[in-house]
Amino acid sequence: MLGIGNLAKLVFGTPNDRKVKSARPLVAQVNALEEQFRALSDADLIGKTRELQGRAQSGEDLDKLLPEAFANCREAARRALGLRAFDTQLMGGIFLHQGNIAEMKTGEGKTLVATFPAYLNALAGKGVHVVTVNDYLAKRDAHWMGKVFAQLGMTTGVVYPFQDDAEKREAYRADVTYATNNELGFDYLRDNMKGSIEQMTQRGHFFAIVDEVDSILIDEARTPLIISGPSQDRSELYKTLDAFMPELAPEHYKLDEKARNATFTEEGNEFLEKRLQAAGILPEGQTLYDPESTTIVHHANQAMRAHKLFMRDQHYIVRDDEVVLIDEFTGRMMKGRRLSDGLHQAIEAKEGVSIQPENVTLASVTFQNYFRLYDKLSGMTGTAATEAEEFAEIYKLGVVEVPTNRPVQRIDEHDRVYRTATEKYAAVIEAIKEAHAKGQPILVGTTSIEKSEMLSQMLTKEGIQHNVLNARQHEQEAKIVADAGKLGAVTIATNMAGRGTDIQLGGNVEMKVMEALAADPEANPDEVRARIEAEHAAEKQAVLDAGGLFVLATERHESRRIDNQLRGRSGRQGDPGRSLFFLSLEDDLMRIFGSERLDKVLSTLGMKEGEAIVHPWVNKSLERAQAKVEGRNFDIRKQLLKFDDVMNDQRKAIFSQRLEIMHTEEVGDIAADMRAQVIDDLIDRHLPPRAYAEQWDVKGLHDAVIDRLNMDLPITDWAGEDGVDQDTIRERIQQATDAYMAQKAEQFGPENMRQIEKQVLLQQIDSKWREHLVTLEHLRSVVGFRGYAQRDPLSEYKTEGFQLFETMLDGLRFDVTQQLARIRPLTDAEREQMLREYQQQQAETEAQMHPEHEEAEGGEVSGRVAGFDETDPTTWGNPSRNDPCPCGSGKKFKHCHGVLA
């Protein structure tokens, strides 16, 4: 029987139905223009773009231009790629243009969909950013979809790591720019550390289309992007603390796996105190509870977390003497990404690899706050509905489920739950053998590298050929995914979220053609393609007859969305398929969330070894547990955002002020205002209002003026005059300072003085902001304890954060004023000394760039092997990543030939 809610939906339709219905008339308008645009020549398509650009840039609403722009783009894609966009793809493009998240199933052509809103919004001339999850996809999509934009007379750029600023500037100035979320965020931070407008790379934040939007805006929302510099070396402390960790007994610590946190118990603190005192780290008489012990306690906690909560091959791998993190949502290696607060160093000590120094934050931003900079934001994904509330609340984005072009024919079976992991894996192997026997391609989903490799060993014992895709095989990813739909293929993969490459039944035609032509360059491309397409059609039919792709998952993820993404790999474009989850009561999700109750139920039912329970109730129970985890994670992200918003408001104020200074030719007024405020502060501090003259601290004011303003003024004499008040002394100091600074400007020349003032302002802003970030981080780490005193940590953080910000601004004014007051022109002798040092530096740089001219003892070329040939990399030995490239390009090795290493 239908409930009242379901009955209402039947009568009135769901909000999603209404949104889809409202887009249909626009799709019809685009379809009505199709024949008209098909009749246009290639030059006419570009001419249409120029006409639409003129209308958009003269103020015409983009919504009015949509039908013509979409029709033009559809025709360009048909000519450039041989792809005609379906109505559902046009609909997805409409929702993206309107600033929504378009939920489109795997295989529905999201890459092509993005070109429609990108083209329409690029007509405004402000640039559009299409955001992908990795560099491979950014380059692939820019090259592939760039053909469509070229057909339309528009430029395409791609941004990736290690480009120089000139290349990045050019990419950002293109009409449409493809980039990863990481690179966009880092470029934003780097731009706000530049010394002039000309050095900046980005040109604003107008419109972004985020692919795999749930992965970027939700899974990575808690990870800030940080540009940092090295701090003091504490490697010995990490090693000493790490040595104690294996000695910890269960009563020494308490684990909270749900929150991924660990704390020492009372017994643990006593154990730690004794060990630290014996090792000489904790001085005699000092306890862990003393304020001086804060750093030691913090690093001991991190060492324990490294041992008890971070597992090798699940959370990280060790490669080339380095701990490389693994993204738990996508299974990808996150090279260059490091855990903060000493946790990464603790893991390095645990694994016995080189311990890299901790870093001090120079600039940071979260993805939540970076993407909220855009005037308009939209996104695409295969799974967003489960997180619709979070998208709406944090990003003000609606989620619209776009209908599939063809009905989904995949069969999603009920989960099978076993009592032990051993029973579960035995059943998994049997299911794989059964499907493999009929040639059905199988995608086996696992949650960690360790489990994927264990399954691989089990399949090898059974003699079943298979591929493994995890962070270790990251480089072969595209090839493995392309082959996963072939007849009889078995592919084991860690989380497939955000992989970006569709699994096509029968294999990927384009990749087969490329391989065939690479193997035989003399072959006729058309003949090769015709042969491969015929073979592919036969193989695809055999796969369809076998039941399509079988997605077999070995565990539920904490997030329903990740499970749905794995399921969505099967049944693309109306193909048949099947998905099935195998679980056990020993799985992490089951163990942490209520497996005991289920175990009792299974015992009551009298289940025997190897038997599974299959029931819709189990699915619902698991989904409730997952919803609980998602809700808790949402609350954590929401709370983190509230804290980050405090810093974000301050960041925006500082970056905006910095930008204004870079844009302003004449910053003398800003420096003069700061000087006036400094003088006011000095007067108020030493000659307080409503204080009698005999209560004034005249000597203190005299010394402060010498220190801050670099002038020895007769303040004692002024204070002794009859009828002199604070305002008179303030005015005299101000006049003397103005005259002193005017004299400096004359000595340097007006143009030089302008440059000096600008550089001093920017340097001091950067320096103060860096110090302020460290202070805010410290405040953030301790403010949580205020909750024990019945005070709201967030309110305390806001209040104290604002006070710290005001203190920073006061310090900024004082330091800028002091530095400008102390500068002076160089003497001739100093200028000659500087010139000599500069020439010496230049000579050293030249020698580094061309070391073949610099011979060491024994006639060997310094830094290179004997028999060196700059055109032959085999003679280069092993250059360090940061050495100049031996080819003589002048670039660092890692940015030149080292890219290929």
From Swiss-Prot:
ATP binds at Q89, G107, E108, G109, K110, T111, D502. Gene3D superfamilies: Helical scaffold and wing domains of SecA, P-loop containing nucleotide triphosphate hydrolases, SecA, preprotein cross-linking domain. GO terms for biological process: intracellular protein transmembrane transport; protein import; protein targeting; protein transport by the Sec complex. Keywords: ATP-binding, Cell inner membrane, Cell membrane, Cytoplasm, Membrane, Metal-binding, Nucleotide-binding, Protein transport, Translocase, Translocation, Transport, Zinc. PROSITE patterns: SECA, SECA_MOTOR_DEAD. Residues 838-883 are annotated as: Disordered. The keyword Translocase applies. It catalyses: ATP + H2O + cellular proteinSide 1 = ADP + phosphate + cellular proteinSide 2. GO terms for cellular component: cell envelope Sec protein transport complex; cytosol; plasma membrane. The keyword Iron-sulfur does not apply. Belongs to the SecA family. Part of the Sec protein translocase complex. Interacts with the SecYEG preprotein conducting channel. Has a central role in coupling the hydrolysis of ATP to the transfer of proteins into and across the cell membrane, serving both as a receptor for the preprotein-SecB complex and as an ATP-driven molecular motor driving the stepwise translocation of polypeptide chains across the membrane. This is Protein translocase subunit SecA. The lineage of its organism: Bacteria, Pseudomonadati, Pseudomonadota, Alphaproteobacteria, Rhodobacterales. The gene is secA.
